[in-house]
Regions:
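Conserved C-terminal beta-signal and adjacent last beta-strands/turns
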Residues: 87, 216, 222, 237-344
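Face-selective signature of the C-terminal outer-membrane beta-barrel domain
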Residues: 1-66, 72, 79, 144-147, ...
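Gram-negative outer-membrane beta-barrel transporters
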Residues: 9, 14, 47-54, 148-151, ...
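Transmembrane beta-barrel strands of outer-membrane/channel proteins
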Residues: 15-21, 56-60, 74-76, 87-91, ...
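Outer-membrane beta-barrel strand-turn architecture
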Residues: 5-9, 46-50, 62, 70, ...
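Residues on the lipid-exposed face of transmembrane beta-strands in outer-membrane beta-barrel proteins
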Residues: 1-5, 40-46, 74-78, 132-136, ...
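Outer-membrane beta-barrel signature, preferentially recognizing the C-terminal barrel domain
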Residues: 79, 84, 91-152, 162-163, ...
């Protein structure tokens, strides 16, 4: 439910409400859980001075388990000509997911057993987010620079716990389907817990350019420094990536009833952090795809496509072990072929 109102000149007011219900059903642990969330929100955007706009918002969230929470948001934007400067503050609330609360999970991946427990004693996360953004846009190029800081209290993290003799006995009792061989390979299990706080800060740069008609280049770079603290110790947030970039080039042209689209894109990233395991190494993976639009039939458009994923055959060839984690799962270079039919 959403309404957009013009209550005064040079302003826009948005009010609304939404309802959501989540379900978790799992045979492992005989789990059958559900929870609803109801929220009402209001946002008012107004012109303060020439090129200066303020936006104020408020959201009231009622969670079936974690009660009511009020979160404000404020943005100030100065927009002279092709430039945009924004400052944003927002408070956040996130209830633990049903998996984080109730998981009772056992699986075997690459021959390694994995166990994850939810925790019904979790508290919801509350956060304070601040960002500064500058943009330049023209018909040829767009450039955006954003710096952000997110402080999170009671951050939900997955703690890895070493398996001793007492823990192994407990785990075998909880998961009788686990074989003796699988139990012998089990070194850790995971439990969702609240850390004291989390700290995520970074910088993001976006650039896109229309080099000439039909040809576009874009690039994105993100630097992220993410940590979590329990007690006096700060640790790098599990699965965080310090440096990540995406690059894409796209060309499109039509000759009569034939259209060609060529897309080259790549993702490059530094290592993925796993504080209790071996970090997953960084990688660069490139894909080349072409799409061909054919308008030769009276009853349909045909769009055959052909491309290559992982163009340079990047593969993580490390020998597997119980401490090893992965970020690149590609088996290697792959030929991708498709056909789309659009009826007229």
């Amino acid at each position: 439910l959403k309404g957009i109102l013009g209550l005064t000149a040079h302003s826009t007011t948005i009010v609304g409400a939404d309802w959501r219900k989540d379900y978790l059903t799992a045979s492992s642990g005989n789990i059958e859980e559900h929870v609803y969330t109801l929220a009402a929100y209001a946002q008012h955007e107004m012109l303060l001075l020439k090129d200066l706009t303020a936006t104020l918002g408020l959201r009231l969230t009622h969670h079936e388990t974690f009660d009511n929470h009020l979160t404000p948001k404020a943005t100030l934007m100065y927009a002279p000509g092709n430039l945009r400067f924004r400052a944003t503050y927002s408070a956040g609330f996130r209830a633990p997911g049903l998996d984080e609360l109730y998981y009772h999970y056992f699986s075997v991946n690459r021959g390694k057993p994995q166990i994850i427990f939810g925790n019904q004693e979790l508290s919801p996360e509350k956060s304070h987010y601040l960002s500064l953004n500058a943009e330049y846009r023209s018909e040829v190029i767009a450039v955006s620079l954003t710096g952000y800081l997110n402080r999170i209290n009671d951050m939900v993290v997955r703690q890895n716990i070493n398996v001793d003799e007492a823990a192994l006995t407990m785990l075998q009792r909880e998961f009788p389907e686990m074989t003796a061989d699988q139990a012998a390979k089990l070194e850790r299990y995971s439990l969702y817990q609240n850390s004291d706080k989390g700290d995520v800060k970074g910088v993001q740069v976006n650039v896109s350019a229309n080099v000439f008609r039909g040809f576009n280049l874009s690039a994105n770079y993100v630097y992220t420094y993410a940590r979590t603290k329990s007690g006096e110790a700060w640790t790098t947030l599990e699965r965080s990536i310090r440096h990540a970039a995406t690059i894409a080039a796209n060309y499109h042209h039509t000759w009569g009833k034939y259209g060609l689209n060529v897309n080259l894109n790549g993702r490059l990233q530094s290592k993925t952090y796993y504080p209790d395991y071996e970090d997953a190494p960084g990688y660069g993976a490139w894909n080349l795809h072409t799409t061909h639009s054919l308008d030769y039939l009276k009853w349909a458009y045909l769009e055959p496509s052909i491309g290559i994923d992982n163009l340079f055959d990047r593969v993580d060839r490390r020998i597997d072990s119980s401490l090893r984690k992965y970020a690149l799962y590609s088996p290697g270079r792959m030929l991708v072929i498709g056909l789309k039919v659009k009826f007229k």
